[in-house]
Amino acid sequence: WIMGHMVNAIAQIDEFVNLGANSIETDVSFDKNANPEYTYHGIPCGCGRTCTKSEKFNVFLQGLQKATTPGDSKYQEKLVLVVFDLKSSSLYDNQASDAGKKLAKSLLQNYWKNGNNGGRAYIVLSIPNLAHYKLITGFKETLKTEGHPELMEKVGYDFFGNDDIDQVAKAYKKAGVTGHVWQSDGITNCLPRGLDRVKQAVANRDSSNGFINKVYYWTVDKRSTTRGALDAGVDGIMTNYPDVIADVLSESAYKSKFRIATYEDNPWETFKN
């Protein structure tokens, strides 16, 4: 999965997919009542990018729905996965459940169209703080109460705080999560970061008793870093330059080992060679 970083305006969806992304990451900011408000990152946001593009969250979801609904004039067949980078650090820990409930309602109405031919992309809820695990339970409860528990088949999870992997496992246990787990590791593209924790996450993914299904590394803009991440065995790379990642994937060392994921590739299944 080539994951376009910080896609917060509807116009950027086409821009990133046309450069080779089959997945996008979108920032979600919350108001003080835990309502998802804008797709907005804010300053600072990494090197070489404008940090302030934004839409109202529900408006962005409507644009995203069109981009991921077959038959729509805006449909982008290649876009199969969306990571919502939830900026829930602005909330109190005890608001996490409310944030999850309100996020589920927004998605249900504006993206899934209440289960009536909505967008088809898989969704990853990416959470900054292990203490916010109730965001997951609130989200799940709401889809159930609203009569659409089947949509949870389209939803996965990620904690992106670079926490100790054993601690991440405990948070999922509390949230009652037993699958659909993506594990991110990374740092802003302005700074270097080693691959030690990525390798730990990959080892967990590939062990018989691991809880991780997929591992992705962020934010990668250089060919050399891309090669390092691929050599470590990641499933996804988040980038400001999807074309750079696509280029490296076409190199002879990688093209027989990796391919670009399509809608038929289940993002919740651990890949077995």
UniProtKB/Swiss-Prot annotation:
The keyword Secreted applies. The keyword Lipid metabolism applies. Disulfide bonds join 45-51, 47-190. The active site is at 5, 41 (nucleophile). It catalyses: an N-(acyl)-sphingosylphosphocholine = an N-(acyl)-sphingosyl-1,3-cyclic phosphate + choline; an N-(acyl)-sphingosylphosphoethanolamine = an N-(acyl)-sphingosyl-1,3-cyclic phosphate + ethanolamine; a 1-acyl-sn-glycero-3-phosphocholine = a 1-acyl-sn-glycero-2,3-cyclic phosphate + choline; a 1-acyl-sn-glycero-3-phosphoethanolamine = a 1-acyl-sn-glycero-2,3-cyclic phosphate + ethanolamine. InterPro entries: PLC-like_Pdiesterase_TIM-brl (IPR017946). Mg(2+) binds at residues 25, 27, 85. Expressed by the venom gland. Binds 1 Mg(2+) ion per subunit. Its EC number is 4.6.1.-. It is found in: Secreted. GO terms for molecular function: lyase activity; metal ion binding; phosphoric diester hydrolase activity; toxin activity. It holds the Pfam family GDPD_2. Signal peptide: none annotated. Its main location: secreted. One of its GO terms (biological process) is lipid catabolic process. It comes from the Eukaryota. One of its GO terms (cellular component) is extracellular region. Its cofactor is Mg(2+). Keywords: Cytolysis, Dermonecrotic toxin, Disulfide bond, Hemolysis, Lipid degradation, Lipid metabolism, Lyase, Magnesium, Metal-binding, Secreted, Toxin. Belongs to the arthropod phospholipase D family. Class II subfamily. Dermonecrotic toxins cleave the phosphodiester linkage between the phosphate and headgroup of certain phospholipids (sphingolipid and lysolipid substrates), forming an alcohol (often choline) and a cyclic phosphate. This toxin acts on sphingomyelin (SM). It may also act on ceramide phosphoethanolamine (CPE), lysophosphatidylcholine (LPC) and lysophosphatidylethanolamine (LPE), but not on lysophosphatidylserine (LPS), and lysophosphatidylglycerol (LPG). It acts by transphosphatidylation, releasing exclusively cyclic phosphate products as second products. This is Dermonecrotic toxin LdSicTox-alphaIB3aiv. The lineage of its organism: Eukaryota, Metazoa, Ecdysozoa, Arthropoda, Chelicerata.
